[in-house]
Amino acid sequence: MRPEFIHLRTQSSYSFLESALTIEKVVELASSNKMPAICLADKGNLFGSLEFALYAVKKGLQPIHGVILNIKYDIDIFAQILLIAKDETGYKNLLKLSSLTFTKNDRKLCDHIDFEDLIEYQEGLIALCCYTDGIVGKCLLARSEEQAMLFARKLQDILGDRFYFEIMRHDLPEEQFIEDSYIRIAAELAIPLVATNKVLFSEKTMHDAHDVLLCISAGVTKEYPDRKTVSENCYFRSPHEMIELFSDLPSAIQNTVNLRERCYFAAHANPPMLPNFATKDISETDLIRKDAKEGLLARLATKFKSENIPLQNQEELKTEYFARLNYELDIICNMNFAGYFLIVSDFIKWSKKEGILVGPGRGSGAGSVVAWSLLITDLDPIKFGLLFERFLNPERISMPDFDIDFCQERREEVINYVRSKYGNNRVGQIITFGKMQAKAVIKDVARVLSLPYKFADYLTELVPFSAVNPVSLEQAMREVPELANAAKGNGLYNLEGEAELIKLVLDTSLILEGLHRHSSTHAAGIVIAGTDLVDIVPVYKDANSDMLVVGYSMKYSEIAGLIKFDFLGLQTLTVITDCKKLLKEQGIEVDFNNMTFDDNKTYQMLCKGKGVGVFQFESIGMKDALRRLKPDSIHDLIALGALYRPGPMENIPTYIACKHKLQQPDYLHELLKPILEETYGVVIYQEQVQRIAQILAGYTLGAADLLRRAMGKKIKKEMEEQEEIFVKGAIANNISESQAKSIFATVAKFAGYGFNKAHAAAYGVISYQTAYLKANYPAEFLVACLNLELNNHDKINLFLQEAKDSGIKIIAPNINISEGYFSVKSVIPQAATCHPQGPLCHPRVGGYPEKVKTVLNHESMKMDSRFCGNDIKGSRNDIEDTGYDKEKSTIIFALGAIKGVTPNFGKLVTDERKARGAFKSITDFIERLPLKSINSKLLENLIKSGCFDELHDNRLQLFSSISKLLAYSASYHAEQESNQFSLIKVSSLSPNILIASDYADNNTLAFYEFESMGLFISNHPLTQYQEIFSRLNILNTADLHNNLPDGTNRVNLAGVIQKKDSRMSARGRFVTLVLSDPENIFELSIFSEEVLKDYVHLLDVKSLVVVNCDIVKDEGGIKLTAKSFSSIEDAINNKQFELQLYPQNHEELRQIVTLLAARTNNRDQSNAKATIYLQSEGVKNFVAKITLPEKFFLQGQDFEILKGYSK
């Protein structure tokens, strides 16, 4: 039966934020309406064309490919044209025209084509003139029928009988206005009419939800005037509705069917299309065999030398390695993958030649001897027991996939090399599509419908978060009762009218969820084709980039025949590169190519859990695992990297116990001991599963890979089939059926979360390399880490703490020493010594008499110097001396790590110092730097960070004088530029521009630093309280790891709140706090609403608090949960202290008495009593005891001062 009507104007969500239909929905609507074909014509792109074609064919429908493009028909005037592919030539021209809209140079007003483009690529295309949005329609709306006729003839001349007049009836006045003229022109020029309907949503009831979608696109609310809207009739009208609507124009309906019959092409899958690496002299197959054999000989020569392998053993090893090489080469060449290996090898060899650090391997590719020989990987697969079949299985043909890690800073250079070698038109990135997921769509819809923010925020926080598998809104409603109730209109708050609006928000969000919102590019994927990309796929180009982007997602790019290469930027490789560069400047060369993984210092450091900065080993739980494991070989590091994941983590205690001979390994069967001995009986790796199947049940390694995959997927039918094969093979190997089934069950359990050993080994090597650098060259390594995290103040704090713990000196920001980035110096000028800010504790209200200032200059009251000072060592002594000369290793704080200061400004400062010497004063600094380089915020943060302490010891005075300093700068530079003579030079006024000011107290200085750098570098607000904390049983964070048993404990900690983060979960609101004390930064959670309510006044950033909390310490690390809070002042004031003081002479006695006298002026409040013990200078062993009758009200710093007189 001949169809009655075909929709030719259906748009999907690839018309971003314009259509509320997915590809699947478009096809399902056509199928349910008994249409044998459907045309997808998205606005401006063909991103969904292959997905559409494959899905339509799967459902038994004919896909018709179309696209709606802008065409320029006058100066800066555009209209729409709908182009449809008639055949393969037409589809290729459709690809070219749609891609041209993104790659033309004149995209300023909109993406478009010109008439010249249409003339060049018209072959195989059918065109519809888009009614009111088209050229003819726009001319008629402008009452220019003559112009309409002119352009109609022009399009007819270009396309002939492949040009149609599209007519629509959405009940819009503009359509009705032009219809008669439109039909008359069509008749006069004999251009066929074709009836269409804009299909943007499935049914009329979806109009309101679609209207919200348009508001999201425009960034406006529904109440916004003059916003874009569409007719409620832009839904998927049935054939019956369309026939009835155009009953007066039956030919327009019939022409939809006729047009469909002219189209006979559908996009389809293609075989892989790679550039041909062969030359006229040698084929790809011969070339890979030649390069691989030469490469293996070079690898073995290096191996024999670095591992001191005796000459008599070398021939045997050569035989083993070449046998494996030839086996792999045969498989690679038979699968026609030689070109792929050669392409990867080429750009990696180029990278290494250019000094760009490449990772030793990533993923299963590290298991290939061919890859090792071609320098693709740097891991000896046979030495590490890696399997080629895990990478390329001869029994399951699929494309190989090398993921390559490059130094992040130089990754673009490699991509540019590939572009230059194969051509810019043949290399491209891969597009990705951002979807409207549950949380985001609720926020978008709530904003459009003007739902108050607090309700929208509450709703979104109720949706559970999962980075790996985002939770759908429908799923969240099933799992979260509050969300389900809201969707039923029960409401979240007792506010009239809000329940109904909340229900509308959720109902609309359910309709729009999953639609495409925008496009971006894949983080690492690059495709390389053997022909221009636009011959195969649509291409896209971002206006800010000159690199092509494939318009299909990764999945459909591969189906189209494009091969993806992952060029990944790994920050750790940048750290290694930068560290080696710093060492090279000192004449130290580190060669990782010949590393033997046996450095004692490295393992000593790891055994102590010193994992900060070490690749894979930075988390608290991993550091704890290192302490318990006490690794002494690269195999331990590889195993731990594979085990430290949900699931396998439960086997860490077994691995550790067996390693330290506290438990006997279970090898399952004596035949399996050679396979499991390395991991103490624990099945960790997928390769072990393959070996077990091979040894025990006679599987080939290829078949064993299929078994591994089946076990990983846990598909019941496949598992049953594999178990039968496994048991039969084991029985043939003289193993009982019951034991075979038992082993199969055990292996299946492990295989479910088994890890790829090739990947674990490659990343284990990177872990070892970073650990080696840190253990042997800690200052240079930490500087490299710091410079990579220049804008992450939490990480900077962490790395500086690690430097302190390692006994490395750190110099605080100094305008005469610091550079744009962190640096390492071996000799520091004397001026760089960390020094006090004049009298650090400025007299307080009702404060100290003049004589007491001598007490305040006690050593305990000097600048805390947690990090800085030429003579400051780490506070912990758990690191053995590694032989590293720490006296020659001082880290200089970076100017670029100060807020509002860039590394470029730091370079400006450094260059000026090199050219004209150190800065002599604040005004000298301002005079010598360009006027435009300094602004108020920059100067403020430089002052607060202490950069100018060497030039001027009163930060508060400089801070108070910022406006005067900037005014002076402007006047000085204006005078310099004018070059005019003046009796009074501006520079002569410089000594008088600073406003008189007292010195800031310790706390003010500490928070100056926190505000400017996000951390406390030379002062910490809690340093002055350390003595009193010990009296109050308030622990230091260092005690948490060292002195507490495993399990749950209740402790008191003190800290300064540095960050506060409020979140929602299905169980309610919780808050995460980041705090610091003089030793560490730590994090704790508050789950109790009651705690949040009772102590909300104490939980502001910068608050000094004492927290009573539960601490859970286990193999996963330490977790802190707050139970109550108090301010530092309350904690001190609510306790009565008894002091015993022992002055050694009259001067000390006078200082004590003066200080205590200053603390007796508040008799209504006291927290201390004092007893003084005096020793007579003339009578041996005579001590006078004086109990003072007064009670005193002491503060934190007082206890620190008086500590010097206690025993």
From Swiss-Prot:
Its EC number is 2.7.7.7. It holds the Pfam family PHP. InterPro entries: DNA_pol3_alpha_NTPase_dom, DNA_pol3_alpha_thumb_dom, DNA_pol3_finger, DnaE2/DnaE/PolC, DNAPol_HHH, PHP_dom, Pol/His_phosphatase_N, Pol/histidinol_Pase-like. SMART domains: POLIIIAc. It catalyses: DNA(n) + a 2'-deoxyribonucleoside 5'-triphosphate = DNA(n+1) + diphosphate. Keywords: Cytoplasm, DNA replication, DNA-directed DNA polymerase, Nucleotidyltransferase, Transferase. One of its GO terms (biological process) is DNA replication. It is found in: Cytoplasm. One of its GO terms (cellular component) is cytoplasm. GO terms for molecular function: 3'-5' exonuclease activity; DNA-directed DNA polymerase activity. DNA polymerase III contains a core (composed of alpha, epsilon and theta chains) that associates with a tau subunit. This core dimerizes to form the PolIII' complex. PolIII' associates with the gamma complex (composed of gamma, delta, delta', psi and chi chains) and with the beta chain to form the complete DNA polymerase III complex. DNA polymerase III is a complex, multichain enzyme responsible for most of the replicative synthesis in bacteria. This DNA polymerase also exhibits 3' to 5' exonuclease activity. The alpha chain is the DNA polymerase. Belongs to the DNA polymerase type-C family. DnaE subfamily. This is DNA polymerase III subunit alpha. It comes from Rickettsia felis (strain ATCC VR-1525 / URRWXCal2) (Rickettsia azadi). The lineage of its organism: Bacteria, Pseudomonadati, Pseudomonadota, Alphaproteobacteria, Rickettsiales.
